[in-house]
Amino acid sequence: AKANKWLKIGTNTMFTYQEVEQSDDGEYALWAPISASFFMLPYWNPYKEDGSLALQDDGSWKGTTENPLAWMENNPLSNKKYKLLSTFYAEATPIKNLTIRSQLSADYGHTTSFYRSFPSYKPNNNYGGAQRSSYDMLNLMITNTANYRFMLNDVHSFNFMVGQEGVDYHYEGFQVTTRGQTNDILTNLSSGSTASSWGDPVTEYSFLSFFGRGEYNYDDRYYADFSVRGDGSSRFGTDKHWGAFWSVGFMWNLRKEKFMQKYKWLTNAQIAINTGTSGNSSINNYEHLALVSGGYKYNNESGIAISQLGNEELSWESTWATNVALHLGFIDR
């Protein structure tokens, strides 16, 4: 929406809710429902004559692996997923040809799941189970840019932009599994006799970037551009957070030259060259840190142990690439 002649503001928000029923596991194993279905022979009927599911218990299931449909019914996994995505922006033009824009985005997700394993189902060996989990994810992003463009003598076109971007990501949750439930109706956590597994993962990272770009073209014939940026990531060592990257490019639009006007069958002809560096930070969030983990027992006492050796020298992966291209067009669309 236009607040006044030099300011525009806007927002966009989306909310979704899903309920998903699925099998408990997708591993490549005969007991996993999805995998087991690939090994079913055509004459293995998953249903009895009365329409109910064929079971190993009464011998109605003739397959050598589990009946995938019966497995899913007796080991149900339900998920509830909430998703909120919202963006707000403000764009100002305080003077002619200058545009200043600020945008804030929030991406939030909440997922809960409930898994049950019914003890009456023979493949479960009269041993029930229950698992509950809950996870939250919040990703915040802010982008600020200032763009200035102008022309000189109707043939020199300039476009300059500087900006900053920040990302803050946080994820946390918990998961608890208990075993030993003896009744199909009471397959909740508190009905189990033992807690077989549990966890409460937390992970987060942040990025901060500053960048600039310049573009110039002369009479739509000669083009030049450059860009520089500095990126900081929490995934690297204390003295290795930052990486600097750049690129330059040139392009000659041959089709605009007078000596090319006679070639009517050639609708486009451009020669381009660019060179520069780019960075990659795709590693685990805490790869650079020495880590310890709990859950170990020493003489029946809770203990911790080293789970990862740190490396403070981890830094950005940098790639330098150069490209030369010839663009030709033969059809005028």
For every predicted segment, state its role.
Residues 234-240:
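Solvent-exposed loop/turn segments connecting transmembrane beta-strands
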Residues 2-83, 101-208, 235, 254-321, ...:
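Surface-exposed loop/interface segments of Gram-negative outer-membrane beta-barrel transport/assembly proteins
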Residues 91, 95-96, 214, 317, ...:
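Long hydrophobic segments that form regular secondary structure
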